[in-house]
Amino acid sequence: MADRGEDAESEDELYEVVNITDYARRHQWWSRVFGNSTGPIAEKYSVASQIMMGGVSGWCAGYLFQRVGKLVATAVGGGFLLLQIANHSGYVQVDWRKVEKDVNKAKKHLKKNAKKAAPELNTFIEDSTEFVKRNIVISGGFVGGFLLGLAS
C-alpha cells in the first residue's frame, strides 16, 4: 500500500499545470492561420490575391444574404397578409388606437436611449473602421463581391 502512495505522488510530479488563458494569449488562432505578423493583410498577399479573396467571400455573403432575405421577406409579408385577411373576415379584432399608442411610446423610448449607445458598440465600430482602413484592398473586393452576390 505504501508503494501505491509513492506512485501517486510521483505521477503528480509528472504533470504540469497550464494556465489556458495565458496560453491563449500567447498562441492566438489567427497567428496560426495568417502567420505571426499581426500587421495588415496587405503585407502578406499581392493585390490581386486580396481582391480575389475579398471578392469570393463577398460574393458568397451577398448570395446567402439575398436568399435568406427573400425567405424572410416572404414570411413577414405572408404573415401580414394572413393577419389582414383574418382582420377583414372578423377572426381578429385589432385595436388600432392601442397599437398607435404603443408605437408612439416605443418611439419616445428609442429617441431617449439612442443618444446613449453602448460602449461595446462604439468599440466594435471603431475596430471595424480601423480594420477597413488597414485592409482597404480586401475590403473593397468584399464590397464588390457582396454587391455581385446580391445581383446574382
Curated annotation (Swiss-Prot):
Recorded superkingdom: Eukaryota
Gene Ontology cellular component annotations, sorted alphabetically: mitochondrial outer membrane; mitochondrion
Annotated membrane-spanning segments are 45-64, 71-92
Protein topology in the membrane:
Multi-pass membrane protein
YXXL: where is this motif?
15-18
User: Sorted alphabetically, which keywords does the UniProt record give?
Assistant: Autophagy, Membrane, Mitochondrion, Mitochondrion outer membrane, Transmembrane, Transmembrane helix
The UniProt entry's GO biological process terms, in alphabetical order, are: autophagy of mitochondrion; response to hypoxia
The subcellular localization recorded is: Mitochondrion outer membrane
| Main subcellular location of this protein, as a coarse class | mitochondrion
- Entries under Pfam families matching the protein: FUN14
Q: State the protein's purpose.
A: Acts as an activator of hypoxia-induced mitophagy, an important mechanism for mitochondrial quality control.
Q: Which family does it belong to?
A: Belongs to the FUN14 family.
Give the protein's recorded name.
FUN14 domain-containing protein 1
